[in-house]
Amino acid sequence: MTAPHRSTIHILGLGAMGTVLAVDLLRFTNALVVPLFRSQERLAQFQKTNGNNISIRKLYLEGSPIFSYPVEKCECPETFSKKPIDNLVVTTKTYQTKEALAPYLPYINKNTNLILIQNGLGVLELLREEIFTDSKNRPHLFQGVISHGVYQDKAGVFNHAGWAGMKIAKLPWTEEEMIQKKSVVEDDAANNSLVKLLTEPKFAKEFGIEHSTYQEMLFGQLFKFLVNACMNPVTAILDCVNGEMKASCGPVFTSIIDECLQILRVAYRPLFQYHEKYSGNEEYPEMDVNAVLTTDNMVSEVTRIGCDINSRNSSSMRQDTLFLRDIEIEYINGYVVKLADNLNLDPNCCKVNKTIGELATMRLALNRSRSINGDWRKD
């Protein structure tokens, strides 16, 4: 009797998002989950600290249980098997993508499925223009927009604080492919090994997987981007847990979102014109971006998702500033500033996001200074 096929999925970036995904893949599928580390030293550190186990505490479940699973195999550039990679999940920080991928590029080819699960925007351009420049040998590219709230506490434990699902879609390598027919989703659901794994009924239900066209995912990505543009830098600047600022965050969220939307409407014009162009065409999904991505609605939604559902969460950017790590501000609020410049818009149209980015960067610099020179407030 032939043994059932077992998919192998490599995960590059075993931080908060990589961990929550890996644990649930181990819980609900039979996939071989292989974390990839950037060096032999980091691999040895993981094995020494965790004993080849990955764990997460589910704060939203009664009793806040910890789920811990052993990983059968871990690799780094020095120990890598040198075999082609079938499925690769990238959950590194956006600014780390190019460097993290570099050692594994020889094993990524046109048959590889690569999914990005990251905050921010702008990585697709990086992949197209600087990494996968040969259009004939590019991998099958997917994006995951994750809304789960996960953070690492001071004891090193990852905490899954809020359950909110993940959207996945095939990414287009060219702008001409931005608008996809429903048949693209149907074909991947039937024939693509990564999509089939992520949409296995048990895992898909528990992780909240929603497989869609690119335009639907981009809609969700812009929605999530607006959440991140508010929650990440503001919690980092204020040094607060999400729910603490619920009563007072409205005015600053309004300023950030209103400015972002003005720029995004220009940069992603086909998406914002989608409803009037494709509504009623059965080959395309129904979607009205302009009914959702309004300033008033998004301030309400960001507050609901960020400060209510994930009230106990500490944002990834706040965690980075607390642990003195580089922050992703250039791919979030900084991305809006860069878009405005690329589109030759008035520099004043992005002054709020520019200031927010500068304050978040200043918060990180202040925390780093205090770690060396002490906290002057205590003198």
From Swiss-Prot:
UniProt-recorded Gene Ontology molecular function terms: 2-dehydropantoate 2-reductase activity; NADP binding
Alphabetized UniProt keyword annotations: NADP, Oxidoreductase, Pantothenate biosynthesis
GO BP term, example: pantothenate biosynthetic process
List of residues binding substrate: 119, 228, 232, 316
Keyword Chloroplast annotated: no
Family: Belongs to the ketopantoate reductase family.
InterPro entries, per database record: 6-PGluconate_DH-like_C_sf, 6PGD_dom2, ApbA, Ketopantoate_reductase, KPA_reductase, KPR_N, NAD(P)-bd_dom_sf
EC number, as in UniProt: 1.1.1.169
Top-level enzyme category: oxidoreductase
Full protein name: 2-dehydropantoate 2-reductase
Amino-acid positions noted as binding NADP(+) in the UniProt annotation, renumbered to this chain: 13-18, 119, 328
Keyword field contains Iron-sulfur: no
Annotated pathway: Cofactor biosynthesis; (R)-pantothenate biosynthesis; (R)-pantoate from 3-methyl-2-oxobutanoate: step 2/2
Pfam families with a match to the protein in the record: ApbA, ApbA_C
Top-rank lineage group of the source organism: Eukaryota
Catalysed transformations (reactions): (R)-pantoate + NADP(+) = 2-dehydropantoate + NADPH + H(+)
GO cellular component, one term: mitochondrion
General function of this protein: Catalyzes the NADPH-dependent reduction of ketopantoate into pantoic acid.
Note: Present with 2600 molecules/cell in log phase SD medium.
